[in-house]
Every structure is written in C-alpha cells, then in structure tokens.
C-alpha cells in the first residue's frame, strides 16, 4: 500500500528570520572565540619570548663574562646586524664625546708623582727588611784573588713570625710604714680585655684573618694549630664579638655621627646574610633567618656598615633620617621615606640620587636579547659615561660647569628619547622594563648634574659590599644578631683602613691598646681618617711596648673643628 503524497513544503517567512538570527549569533560567537584565541596566542607568544629571554640571560650569567663590560668582538658577534643599523647614532654620540675631549684640559699631576710602573717590580724601592746572602767562591777567596764586586738580584721572601707567649711581670714591693710591712703592687695598664687569654695583637690577627682575608674560624683554627697555638673557634668568636661591639659603640659610632652631620655625598646599598637564631626551648636548632647589611661610602672619608634584621623603610629612616645631603642609592622603595615623607619646617633634607649603572644593566639585558631599544639606550648611556670621564680629568673646581655644559645635553637627549620611545613600545618585556625604569627614575638620575662631586653610579657602594658577599660564602652565616652587629663595626674599620692605605692589623693592634685611655668626646680622632695624625702625636715607646699606659695628647685641631661644627650650638 503506497503512502499518500506529501504536501509541498513552503518555508514560512518567520522560519527564515529565525535562521538568520541564529546565523548572526553563531557568527558573533565565532568572532568572539577567534578574538579570545588570538589574545591567548599572543599572550602565550609573549610568555615564550620572555622565557627565551630569561633563558638567554641565565646562560650568559652562567657561561658569559661576569662583568658588565662587553668587548667589541663580543657585541659584534651577538648584535652585528643591530649595530650596523645604529651606526649613524654611534657617529653622532662619538662626535658629542669628541667635543668634550677637545674642550677639557686634564688636571696636571702633582710634582714628584711617580710614573706608572712598567715591567718587573723593582724590589730595591721596597721598604721591607733586607736579608743579604753573599755567595762566595771558596777557592778564589783562599787563593787571595781580589774581589771586585757583586752581581745583585732580589726576590721577595717570607718568614713566618708566629705566635709567642707574652709574660707580664708586675713588680711587688714591700713597703714599711709605721714599722708595719705592706705589699704594694704596680698598677697594670688599662685594657679592653681584663684577665684575657689573648693579647690585642692576637685579637687583631684573628679579626683581620677573618674579615680582611675571608678566612673562617675553622680554617684559622687549623692554621694556628700548625703554628703551635691551640685556639678553638668558640674562643675566637667570643673575642671577635667583644672587640666588634666595643669598636662599634666607640669609634664606628663617632664615624657614623660625623658622616651624617658633615658629609656631602653618601653612596649606599644593601645585601642579605644568614643569621643563626637561638635554639628553641626544648634545645632544637632553628633554620637560619635572613638579616641585612647596609653600607655607606661617605665622600672619600670612610666606608661604614650597619646591620639590621629587616630591610625596611623604618630602619633606613633611623639610619639616614638626620642626614642633610645627597644620598645615592638604587631604586628600592625603602629610601622613598627619606625624600617623600611628611613635610618638614626646613626644606633642607636628603636628596636622593639615582644610579646610571642600574639603568645600564636593564638596557644591557634588553640589548643581549636583541631588542633595538636596549642597544640604542646602551649606546647613549655609554656616551654619557665617556663624556663624564673626560670631565672628571679636569680640576675639581670646574667640573660642575663642564658637566652642565657637555654632559647635560647628552642626558637631556637620552630622556627625550626615552619618553618618545616609551610611547611606541608595546608589551611587557625587557625593553619596556628598561624604558620604565628610566622614566620612573628620571628626577633622581638627573640630580648627578647638580654638582661635579656626584658620581654617575652607585658602584662604589656595591664594591664595598663584596666583603660581605665573600664572607657569606666563606662562613655561611653569623652566629647571632649581636655577632652580625659586631661584624658590621669590624667591616667598617677594615674598609676604612683600606680606603686610607692603613694596615688593618697594625691599626687594630694599636687601637685596642689606646682606646681605654681615650675620652668619649674624642673617639673620632681614632678613626682611620685621622689615625696618622693622632698616632704621630703619641709617644713612640708607648706604641712599641706590647703592654703600656698611654699619655693622651691635646685634642687634634682638625677634628676639634669638625666636632665644633657638628655641635647643636653651631
């Protein structure tokens, strides 16, 4: 049985409209999905590019040159095509630097300055003690031949001085008074370490071995045992902590007060270090915590260190809050409280100065990852450094004017380029990071133009922190917060001794004997900056005797003038 024929299907007008609406909705959804997918793909591509750049930087830190200097051959291999495109910019910058070199006459060297040594060192100019060995011909000497001279040659030799036992013999006298005999003992000279096992010279040796040479106590313990001096590391740690705390509360404290009161430029930076906390109540050791060391390079007068448990704005305010001058630091926000704190009655305060070396690192990383922006910024910063190096060769009195005349145009051109390039550089990558750092730090970076005494960067503070970093690798951690504070004081003394070309061992050995006799208001006279003048006014026989009382001379005129200018009444 056949089915009846179906009626002709005629689409209604309403069905066509519904299909058109559904098609439009589907097309809109498809467009949205495509847009979302494109955004995700672009984001993933940016992530892949950033990870590739991070991998490039990590490989460079592992296998490349650890310094920030790049030799011409290295740049040509890595950035050959980019360098070719920036040839015109390089020529323009070279021309600007050439104008400075033509205009600036270098400062003449003082009369009597020795030329730079060439070839092998001439040991005949050394002030070291001499051991003369004559090599003779026994047969010719016995036969009566006339000796007509010697052929002299010199070598640097070493003789171990070693330890010795210092015996202090205090005389006792029988005194007869009113037919009665009494025993009278000569008063012993004052000392920082009464009834101590170690003399000040041994303490100075332990301190300089660890904090000047980076020898941890366990290695020093082995070396002392080889020399016949049995001294355990616990004893050494106790003496070092005692000496460091005394120096920190006296000489280093006076140096900090002098720096905050009289310095014009302070360069500062900070680094971390591990601190061993105390054991729990049940005697279990705890994991090390992190502390922080701040350094302050004070003009050309001192290098100081301070320890804190936390890297915070509160500590920075306590440390530098009373300073009135230029404070050069990195872009860490802990320093902002010094300049952007609550308004004060006086406009005089800390003026933060930026660091072109930090900016250069951001540009360098962008250039290594083949961003043209990074290379252009690097070339411009190099021109600023080259022009400023020429300015620094001029007499100090005219450096500010020369820097304003020749370096300022390069700095103005650099920041004009930064703002223009930042507007057309999209994304979140190393290029935008470098440009953002430059734009955010423009005010602080421009402050180097205010005076010729300001360096372009903060690298001298970073160099001062190297001893902390080397120690961090050598002895891993500090025993307590108190020991870290003592270490900061010792680092301050040793770094300042290096700055003023003093032997840290001799300085510490003599200071630890002189300090008990010095008055509190004159501790600055014992700082490395003034020690040569102070030492020259002490009696030589008192300094030469291992145990001696000291006659304190009148105040040093130069230090007295500094102290008077720092007093509240001035």
For each feature predicted by the language model, list its residue ranges.
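Acidic/histidine-rich catalytic cores and adjacent linkers
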Residues: 331-334, 379-570
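Short, flexible loop/hinge motifs at secondary-structure junctions
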Residues: 1-197, 263, 267-268, 527, ...
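Mobile genetic element proteins and their domesticated derivatives, centered on retroelements
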Residues: 64, 140-141, 175, 206, ...
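Active-site-adjacent "gating/activation" loops or surface patches in catalytic cores
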Residues: 163-218, 286-303
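Gly/Pro-rich turn-and-neighbor structural signature
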Residues: 121-124, 128-146, 218-322, 389-453, ...
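Conserved beta-strand -> loop -> alpha-helix junction used to position metal-binding or nucleic-acid-contacting
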Residues: 265, 326, 331, 342-376
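Short helix/loop capping segments that flank catalytic or ligand/cofactor-binding pockets
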Residues: 149, 183-186, 275-277, 304-306, ...
């Amino acid at each position: 049985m056949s089915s009846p024929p179906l009626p002709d299907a005629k689409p209604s007008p309403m069905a066509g409209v519904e299909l058109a609406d559904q098609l439009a909705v589907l097309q809109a959804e498809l467009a949205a999905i495509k847009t979302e997918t494109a955004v995700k793909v672009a984001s993933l591509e940016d992530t892949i590019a950033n990870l590739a750049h991070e991998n490039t930087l990590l490989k460079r830190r592992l296998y490349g040159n650890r310094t920030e200097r790049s030799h011409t051959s290295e740049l040509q291999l890595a950035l050959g095509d980019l360098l070719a495109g920036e040839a015109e910019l390089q020529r323009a910058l070279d021309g600007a630097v050439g104008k400075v070199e033509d205009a600036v006459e270098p400062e003449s060297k003082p009369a009597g300055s020795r030329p730079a040594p060439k070839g092998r060192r001439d040991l005949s100019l050394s002030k070291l003690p001499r051991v003369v060995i004559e090599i003779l011909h026994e047969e010719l000497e016995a036969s009566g031949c006339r000796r007509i001279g010697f052929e002299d040659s010199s070598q640097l030799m070493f003789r171990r001085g070693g330890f010795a036992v210092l015996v202090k013999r205090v005389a006792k006298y029988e005194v007869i008074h009113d037919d009665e005999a009494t025993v009278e003992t000569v008063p012993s000279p004052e000392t920082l370490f009464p009834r101590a096992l170690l003399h000040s010279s041994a303490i100075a040796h332990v301190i300089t071995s660890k904090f000047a040479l980076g020898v941890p106590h366990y290695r020093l313990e082995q070396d002392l045992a080889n020399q016949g001096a049995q001294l355990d590391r616990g004893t050494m740690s106790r003496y070092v902590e005692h000496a460091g705390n005394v120096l920190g509360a006296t000489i280093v404290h006076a140096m900090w007060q002098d720096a905050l009161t009289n310095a014009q430029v302070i360069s500062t930076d900070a680094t971390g270090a591990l601190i061993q906390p105390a054991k729990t109540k049940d005697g279990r050791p705890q994991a090390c915590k992190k502390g922080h060391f701040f350094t302050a390079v004070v003009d050309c007068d001192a290098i100081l260190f301070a320890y804190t448990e936390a890297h915070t704005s509160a500590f920075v305010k306590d440390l530098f809050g009373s300073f009135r001058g230029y404070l050069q630091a990195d872009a860490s926000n802990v320093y902002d409280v010094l300049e952007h704190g609550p308004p004060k009655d006086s406009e005089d305060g800390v003026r933060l100065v930026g660091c072109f070396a930090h900016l250069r690192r951001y540009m360098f990383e962008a250039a290594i990852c083949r961003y043209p922006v990074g290379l252009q910024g690097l070339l411009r910063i190099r021109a600023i450094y080259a022009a400023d190096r020429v300015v620094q060769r001029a007499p100090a009195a005219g450096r500010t004017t020369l820097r304003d005349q020749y370096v300022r145009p390069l700095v103005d051109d650099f920041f004009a380029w930064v703002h223009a390039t930042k507007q057309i550089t999209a994304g979140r990558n190393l290029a935008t990071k470098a440009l953002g750092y430059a734009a955010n730090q423009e005010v602080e970076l421009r402050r180097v133009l205010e005076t010729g005494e300001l360096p372009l960067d903060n690298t001298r503070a970073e160099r001062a922190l190297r001893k902390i970093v080397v120690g961090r690798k050598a002895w891993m951690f500090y025993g307590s917060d108190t020991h870290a504070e003592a270490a900061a004081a010792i680092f301050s003394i040793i770094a300042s001794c290096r700055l003023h070309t003093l032997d840290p061992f001799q300085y510490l050995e003599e200071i630890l004997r002189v300090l008990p006799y010095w008055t509190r208001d004159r501790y600055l006279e014992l700082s490395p900056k003034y020690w040569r003048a102070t030492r020259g006014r002490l009696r030589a026989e008192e300094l030469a005797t291992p145990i001696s009382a000291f006659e304190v001379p009148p105040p040093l005129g130069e230090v007295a003038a500094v102290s008077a200018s720092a007093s509240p009444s001035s």
